[in-house]
Amino acid sequence: MNKKLAAVLLAGALLFGAAPLQAQESSSIDAVTAGVADTDRADKEAEKKITASTVPYSVAVLPYIDQSGMDEKGRKVAANSIKDALKEKYPPAKKGGVNTVASAKAVAKAMQNHPFENADAPVLAELVAVGKELGVDRVIYMEMEPPRNKETGFMVIVGSQTYSSVITMKLKCVDVKTEKYLFNRIVEEVGSSSAVAFWKIGGASQSRAVKKGVAACMTEFLTAFD
């Protein structure tokens, strides 16, 4: 009986490949594509929620810098996701908001008077200068880098698809009075969209993946300070 059992185990090992004695870790090379798998960390939804600020300060939101290289639809989806997140953080007074948001016209004039040496890489002193001219307490800067996208799945008549997008954003929030950063990081998050589709009906959407990824970046940003 023992010999038969040993033979069965040996056959199984030869058929499927014997497992190593010690679990093998993924190498740093394997990790390069981990962000765009279909995807284990895909939607970190509902881990954090953006809530309206309860501290009555004034804030200037500088023009969003889009370096994504996406098509028009993707750019619009990303911009709308950013705007929605900011409106959650800073709702208007009629919806209970306690913050004063600088007008787009005033921000444009202040930036014209204090141009950045590098529009896509403003330094602390430049952001503070804009904030002081506007007379605001805080300044917000946002930039989106080119996303890394991947599509997986198959389609014959009925199939499944997954789009995943790794979204990378440079995000800054400056306290003008203290002349210090409240937030100054490059944030990277993954958004994904999956679907089982019939022919081309009801498939996964790359724009939904982008929207989720941008929303996750903005949540990480706007929940870091009140």
Can you annotate each of these PLM segments?
Residues 1-9:
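Bacterial N-terminal signal peptides that target proteins for export
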Residues 9-17:
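Bacterial N-terminal signal peptides
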Residues 19-23:
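Sec/Tat signal peptide C-region and signal peptidase I cleavage site
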Residues 55-145, 176, 180-184, 211-212, ...:
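N-terminal segment of the mature soluble domain
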Residues 69-71, 149-155:
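Extracytoplasmic/secreted cell-surface and envelope-processing proteins
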Residues 78-79, 158-160:
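Glycine-rich, phosphate-binding/catalytic loops in enzymes
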